[in-house]
Structures are given as C-alpha cells and as structure tokens.
Amino acid sequence: MHSYAQTNVQLFNQLRCEGYSKKDRESVREAYEFALRLFTGLFFPSGKTFIDHLVGTASVLASLHVPVEMVTAGLIHAAYLHGNFGGIRKGISETTRNQVRLAVGPEVEEYVVRYERMPWDPEIFPVLLDTIDKLSRIDRDVLLMRLANDLEHNLDFGSLYRDNWREYIQHGGPAMVSMAEKLGFPSLSAEMASVFKEILTQAPLGPRIGTSEPAAYLIVPKSYHERFWVVYLPKAHRLCLEILNTLRRLRWKGSKLIHGLLRALSEMPGVHGRR
C-alpha cells in the first residue's frame, strides 16, 4: 500500500520531514480548517471521506517538493465543485471566490479556480499532451495538480467503487502517464503507470458500502434541518429560468409566424395598391 498521508496529522508530519517551513505548515493548517467546513459530511462511493482524498492529493504534491501554494491548493482543489459555502449556489462566483481568497489568499485561489476550469476528459488528454510546452507556468502547475488528484483516487483502489472508472483509466491512463513525464516528473509518471496497471487487472472489490451514488455524496446527521431558502429558492430560480426561456422561444416562434403571414399577404394578387 502507498505511504501518502490520509490525515491532517500525517500531512503535517510529512511537510516537516520534507523541509517545508513553519510558516508553510501554518498555511496548510489554515487551508485544512477551511476544508473541514467546505466538505463536511462528504463521502465517496467507497465510503472514504472526501477530506481524506484532499489530504492525499496534497500529500502527493508535497512529495514532489512543489511550492506550498500548490500543496495548499491541492488540499481544497474541489472547492468550486463540491464545496458548501453556505449559500444558495455552488460553483464559481465572485462571492465564493472571495471566500476562498480570504481563507487561503489570492495566489492559492487562482490555482483552485484554474483547476476547476481546466477541461479534463480522456478525449481532451491528447490535446493537453501535445500543447504542454505552450502552457503557461501556472497552467502547467494546475495540470500537475490534476495528475496528483487522479493518482490519489487510484492508490487504494477506491476508484473501483465508481462506475466506468476502468474505462476512464484504460482510455486516459497512458496520456496521463506521458503528461507527468513531459512535465518533468518521471517518478510520478512511473508510479501512475504502475498504479493504473494494477487498477486494470483488479477483480471487482468488496464488500461495498450500501449506496448507489456514482460520485461524492453528502451524509448529514439526523438532527440536520434544511433551511427553506437554501433548499427551495434554487428550485424556484431554476423554474423561473425555464419559464423565461420557454416564453422567449414562444415569442421567437410567434414573431416568425407573424412575419410569415405578413409576407404571404403581401405576395397575394391584388393586395398591393388596394384602397
């Protein structure tokens, strides 16, 4: 089994052993406390807590001796996908970005927002591989974060509890291995190749947690009560958008119909010049 950190204490010990300064370790601690609030109650289909995966991703990055800003970003890399900011909407907005900036600083936040915006699919991997040399420094760093994330997902075979993951590795694995090599991290490339090979040869795992969720999902305490405005306002907002879009389509169709009728009338014999 792998030796990467899965808890905050293990990560802090690793950072100290890897030579990160006390100031660096404090930055990571602050990000971890922020992550605890963002990802409370999140689990993977394997039953693994989401925060363990985040710590593992940061640990992979720390083992590569990257700047602490990248390690910190790795610890909250899914903020805009799965983070709960306490408001109506998730995702990237000026409000959520400001919260992340206040918690970890603008440089780390820039990594996180670029991570979320980077296209990531086996279909796009050949393009990324061919254009690595043309990427900016920060986008190369973000690409490395993406690779660290996918390695961590597979280290303990936890990815096998998710549907279609073998196909994902089969189609995208070779390109990811090549990307790590091209970025200048041969040890990461070799480890990814080894782990991906094991993933593809493993039999279905068990026992399985009793969930049908395909990806990260939320488990809340029984005492949890949903706030009305958080639950129903987004639904009302989506309904209003659907109604508005429907009205726009009807207006467009009606406008075309009226123009068509007017054109037909204008072309009828005897219409022009009639008094």
What are these regions (language model features)?
Residues 1-275:
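Active-site helical microenvironments for divalent-metal-assisted chemistry
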